[in-house]
Amino acid sequence: MDYQNIIAEEKNGVGYLTFNRPKALNSFNVDMHREVAEVLNLWTKNPDVRCVVISGEGRGFCAGQDLGDRVVDPNAEAPDLGYSIETYYNPLIKTIVNMPKPVICAVNGVAAGAGANIALACDLVIAAKSANFVQAFCRLGLVPDSAGTWFLPRAVGHARAMGLTLLGDKLQAETAKEWGMIWDVVEDAELKAKVAELAERLAKQPTFGLSLIKKAIHQSSNNTFDEQVLLERDLQRIAGRSEDYREGVQAFMNKREPNFKGR
C-alpha cells in the first residue's frame, strides 16, 4: 500500500516503518498518525512480521508534533491538546508497548518532544553517534506526553528526568547510553546495517516467548516482588506450552539450529 507520510516495507521477517516527512523533521500531522497506526496495527496481527523497526528519513528521527498543523490563533478558543494525546499519541505508545514482538527504534539526528518519547517506548533503541534527545515541551509551556513522564524517570532516575524535562537540553546519544536510556550507539554510516542485523536476529528468535518477556519487564515497574514472581510463574507456564519451546528443546538435544514459528 502506498503512503504519503511514511514508508512501510517487509523484509526477512522484519517490518520497517520509516517516518517520511523529512522537510518537517518527520514531525506528526494527523495524516501521518493515521498511516502509522494503520501499519502498526496490521503488523501486530501479521505472523510473518516478527520484528518491527521504526526510523526516520533524512536528517532527523522525529521532531514530535508538527506545530504548523496546530496553529494557535490568539483570538480563538484555546485548542484541546488533550484530544490529540487521547486520540493519537497514547494509542501509538500503547501499540508499541503491547506489540507481541520486538520493536527497535533507530534514531538518527534529533528525537525531540513526542519523537524522543516514541523512541523510549520501543524495546531497543539504537542511535547514531550524531543523534540527540530533547524533551522540548518545556520550551512551549507544555508537559511531556507520549508516556515520557513514565518512561524517563524509570530509565534515568528522578534527578536526571527532572533536569531533562525542566531544562529541555539536548542529550547526546553517547550520554543517553551511559545513563541507561538507550541500548547502543553506532557510527552514523553503520546505523541502518547494524539495526537490520539486530532485527533479523530477533526475527529468528522464539518471538512468542519474547512477547512474554516484554510483558514481564513492563509490569515489573508497578508490581510488588510477590506479584512479580507470581507473574513469572504464570508466564513461564504459558511459554512452556508453546510450540517454540518444544522446538527449542528438540533443536538443542539434536544439536541443530531451531526453526521458531512465533507460537
Q: Where are these predicted regions, by residue range?
A:
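Terminal peptide-recognition signature
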Residues: 17, 21, 36, 54, ...
